[in-house]
């Protein structure tokens, strides 16, 4: 069996069906003896360019190990499902199980957002303390 990275884009009006689609696709792979090494739902994102006058899509990424037969069936499912507006299948040399760059970037963004919010509250408290110490120094003079 070979390893593949599969990314598919779902029409934004069909986002609620993504869970069912992922279940169907994982079931198809596992019934043929394959394995799902990584599954990431990247959510609804802006497209770089419009596809059929659609500017956003729901992104899903799978790293799988499967047979050629299962992959062909999966690609047929993508082709005949109107909700899937694009798909990409890349053959990999080995299983990839760590978080993707997209997921890492999202985590970094949320961490930076949290850090930005914390110092604002901390700076306000420190600013009050430093002003008090400055005032007490001035009072001693």
From Swiss-Prot:
Pfam family, one: Ribosomal_S6
Biased composition regions of type Basic and acidic residues, renumbered to the chain: 103-124
Biased composition regions of type Acidic residues, renumbered to the chain: 125-141
Positions of transmembrane segments: none
UniProt-annotated stretches for the region Disordered: 96-141
Entry similarity comment: Belongs to the bacterial ribosomal protein bS6 family.
Protein known as: Small ribosomal subunit protein bS6
Organism field: Pseudomonas entomophila (strain L48)
């Amino acid at each position: 069996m070979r390893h593949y990275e599969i990314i598919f884009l779902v029409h934004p009006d069909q986002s609620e069906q993504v869970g069912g689609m992922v279940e169907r696709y994982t079931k198809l792979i596992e019934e043929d003896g394959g394995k799902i090494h990584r599954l990431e739902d990247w959510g609804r994102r802006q497209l770089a360019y419009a596809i059929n006058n659609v500017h956003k899509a729901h992104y899903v990424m799978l790293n799988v190990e499967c047979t050629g037969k299962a992959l062909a069936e999966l690609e047929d499912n993508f082709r005949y499902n109107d909700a899937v507006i694009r798909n990409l299948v890349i053959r990999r040399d080995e299983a990839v199980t760590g978080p993707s760059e997209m997921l890492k970037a999202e985590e970094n963004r949320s961490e930076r957002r949290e850090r930005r919010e914390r110092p604002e509250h901390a700076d306000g408290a420190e600013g009050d303390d430093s002003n008090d110490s400055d005032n007490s120094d001035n009072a001693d003079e």
